[in-house]
Design a protein with these regions (language model features):
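Expand to "…catalyze enediolate/carbanion chemistry for C-C bond making/breaking, isomerization
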Residues: 1-256
Length: 256
């Protein structure tokens, strides 16, 4: 019996459009609710969300069996956290602040068992192998691991042609918030200069033959980035959905 099929990776590699939701509230209930609503993927945010390993595991369980695929964003691309998140059962990881092809290759190596990488071997003890109930897990896990690297500085954007061609990198995701800050336009994600850099980045990623992703909360942004070759878009977040609903409800009350 092989490792579970990663349908998100298959979709990404085939060029199929994938729309997803950011989960930052660290809530299994929210994850379960989001997973039942037809998004292609939900990302559990371990970088900015208040997520530790037990909370990440709870949300992975909540998404298991749902039609939505789970992604975990780790705080940084260190071996120990990638190993533990993969052992928890995540098959797709997003690693922030990757700036060079060398860093990207290092991330891929940390996610793969030998001989392709150096992921620590403890699969018999963990959820990823259904606690050793998947006999061929170790031999088949590598092909089901999906690696997404996040580029979010000017240095990284200039290095996209090399980063995107690293074997084992399946998707390059542009982070507009940190990118805008790095360019001197803090919190101005739609500044014209920022959009020019993102547009070139999206085209460079697509030209390398891997999935190009970014954040696109508005229909206008979604159309723009799809037109630039984007196939992997974050279209909302649990926090913004909840906040906007609260504000709309309060506004409606004030009008009565």
């Amino acid at each position: 019996m092989p490792a579970p099929k990663n349908k998100l990776k298959s979709a990404i590699l085939s060029g199929k459009m994938q729309y997803g939701l950011w989960l930052s509230l660290a809530s299994p209930g929210v994850a379960e609710m989001a997973g039942s609503n037809g998004f292609d993927w939900c990302l559990i945010d371990g970088e900015h969300g208040p997520n530790d390993l037990p909370r990440i595991e709870e949300q992975l369980r909540a998404l298991a069996g749902q039609p939505t695929s789970a992604i975990v964003r780790v705080p940084q691309g260190d071996d120990w956290i990638l190993k533990q998140v993969l052992d928890l059962g995540a098959q797709t990881v997003l690693v922030p602040m990757v700036e060079t092809a060398e860093q990207a290759a290092d991330v891929v190596a940390a996610c793969k068992y030998a001989p392709e990488g150096r992921r620590g071997v403890g699969y018999a003890l963990v959820r990823a192998s259904n606690y050793n109930a998947i006999p061929d897990y170790a031999k088949t896990a590598n092909e089901e691991v999906c690696v997404i690297v996040q580029v979010e500085t000017l240095t990284a954007m200039k290095n996209i042609p090399q980063i995107a061609r690293v074997p084992g990198v399946d998707c390059v995701f542009i982070g507009p918030a940190d990118l805008s800050a790095d360019m001197g336009y803090l919190a101005e994600l739609n500044h014209p200069d920022v959009l020019v850099v993102i547009a070139q980045g999206m085209k460079d990623i697509a030209a390398a033959g891997v999935a190009a992703g970014t954040i696109a909360f508005s229909e206008k942004d979604q159309k723009r980035f799809v037109g630039q070759g984007g196939t992997f878009l974050c279209v909302e977040a649990d926090v913004t959905l909840f906040q906007s609903a609260l504000q709309a409800t309060k506004l409606a009350i004030n009008r009565t």
